[in-house]
Amino acid sequence: MKISQLFLGLVACSTAFAYAGIDGISSNESNIKIGAAANASHPGGVAAVSVQAAGAPYNAFTGFSSLKGLAQAFAAQGTSNTNVTVGSKTFNISHIPVSAMPPSHSALGNFNFGQVGTQEVYFGEWWKAGDTPASASHTVYYAGDNTNTTVPTAGTATYTVAGINGSASNLLSGTFTANYGAGTLEGTLTGTGTAVSSLSLDGVAFNPGTAAFAGLATANGTAGVDNSGVVQGQFFGANASALAGIAQFDNVSYNTAFGGAKN
């Protein structure tokens, strides 16, 4: 089914993927599932992820902060965990290629994900071992702690936003503007060295009561223009201090995860 045909359904169920204390979405829950409970051997933080595609016992929920530790522990083998400045904001970016993993962890596949500052808000991508970000297994996701989240109902604000699309070293970046009174979110991300060179939000609307947003997107890049995109995401924190979301396209190589901090 085409992504554009899914838009109304996604808007209708924009809160269907909420967990106790966590809001999050995966573009393909057969591959990646977002949750709030990490198992005892992989704790840390609140937001957690399960690699459903790996099967038992590798599909247990793992805290994102635990995955950050994995990215730090195997740096000599090719993983990385670094702080990146975008505008005036800091994002912590983790890169975990399957080629750097010991055999005991190879079933976990490939991870690129970011954290918005020090908040419990994450966004990223995954694909199977042996695949590429252009393959059908390319999955984007976000997860965040929704505790004490509030969204203003008047005024405007800008967000410095980073996007992940096929690379942890080449980020998309840009500014989103939220009009709290009108309930709209707009902006564009641009970058180089990724399948997507620009991604623009088109008619994205949000409900301050649920803090969720949804709408359409257009991307341009290595395969030309794709206007089939659907955006879904969430504000997090007091006065909507952060946001995260995903954009899905008919061309899965254009699928992008993003997160942002309020200026």
From Swiss-Prot:
Residues that bind heme b: H42, Y58, S104, H105
Example of a GO MF term: metal ion binding
Q: State the Pfam families in the record.
A: HphA_C, HphA_N
Residues spanning the signal sequence: 1-20
Q: Name one GO cellular component term.
A: extracellular region
List the effects observed when the gene is inactivated: In a mouse pulmonary infection model, the mutant shows a small decrease in bacterial lung burden and systemic spread.
Which of UniProt's keywords are assigned here? Answer: Heme, Iron, Metal-binding, Secreted, Signal, Virulence
Q: What induces it?
A: Part of the hemO gene cluster.
Read off the domain note. Contains an N-terminal clamp-like domain that binds heme and a C-terminal eight-stranded beta-barrel domain. The loop containing His-42 undergoes a large conformational change upon heme binding and release.
Functional summary from the UniProt entry: Part of a high affinity heme acquisition system. Functions as a hemophore that acquires heme from human hemoglobin and delivers the heme to its cognate receptor, HphR, facilitating transport of heme across the bacterial outer membrane. Apo HphA interacts specifically with human hemoglobin and steals heme through a passive process probably due to its high affinity for heme. It can also acquire heme complexed to human serum albumin. Plays a supporting role for full virulence, acting as an accessory factor that enhances the process of heme uptake.
Report quaternary structure and partners. Answer: Monomer in solution. Interacts with host hemoglobin.
Please identify the protein, giving its name as recorded.
Answer: Hemophilin
Gene, per the UniProt record: hphA
